Amino acid sequence: QTIIKQLNQNIDSYISYMDNIASVIAQSGDAYKYLYSEKGYGATKDENYSEYRQRLVEQFKTILKGRADIRNIGIVREDKNTPSLFDNGLSVRNTYVDLNTQPWYADAVGKYDRYNLTSSHVQNVIKGERPWVITLSRGICNYTGTEAEDGVVFLDLNYSAISELCAQSSMGDKGYVFILDQNGNIVYHPQQQQLYNELQTENISLVMNAESDIVTAESGDDEKIYALSRSKTTGWTIVG
């Protein structure tokens, strides 16, 4: 139980650090001016607009250079014809993706008081890319006086970043750690592929409905003891 609680604290600290990065971008004058400027998409010849973009690109590049665990950084709006910006400024939006079907976007847009955090998923908002990531996102407030409020900043965190944190928590020869989000979706599991292929199972409903920090699942001769730690910061449940 102590190991699980410590891991929970480590993950909370990690996610809070990443949210600090997202918050700096979300509150940046360059970000909201770039996304919401009335000149918008056709303003690339405007001197100030080009400066907003260049400063954002340099900021993104600096972050990516210092954090190998961040796969992508981007700011985007719902409309495919409005500005977006990813990574080093060369990546292009995948126009076939409806952002309203993407939880990292739909659950963050218009919300400025806290971040949104997804379970592990395939990120396909950038053309030609399909990395397996966990996405942290925030709404970007519009201070330009126009009515649009659909901008979002997102950080795609490499799945390996969370798996490495979990791997550092030794649970003995047969023990292991996995993570569920607030809806019971799997964020991380060491045998995630086997779970998707139904070659392995976990009693997720038992875990999600547990009223104590330790629950026992029995299945024939097999008995599993789950130790739980729920995070008020991320909404995730760490299970070992």
Regions found by a protein language model. Give the residues of each.
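Solvent-exposed, extracytoplasmic
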Residues: R53-L64, G151-Q194
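Juxtamembrane extracytoplasmic/periplasmic/luminal helical "stalk" adjacent to the first N-terminal
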Residues: Q1-Y41, G66
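Extracellular/periplasmic juxtamembrane segments that couple receptor/chemosensory ectodomains to their
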Residues: N183, Q192-G240
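Short, hydrophobic-rich beta-strand element in sensory/regulatory alpha-beta domains
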Residues: A22, R71-I75, G175-F178
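Amphipathic coiled-coil signal-relay and dimerization helices
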Residues: K33-L35, N81-G89, G184-P190, A227-S229
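Extracytoplasmic/periplasmic ligand-binding sensor regions of membrane-associated signaling proteins
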Residues: K65-N72, D79-L157
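Amphipathic alpha-helical bundle/coiled-coil segments
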Residues: D12, D98-Q102, D156, D181, ...
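Short, hydrophobic beta-strand elements of compact beta-sandwich sensory domains
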Residues: L136-G139, T144, E149-Y159, G220-G240
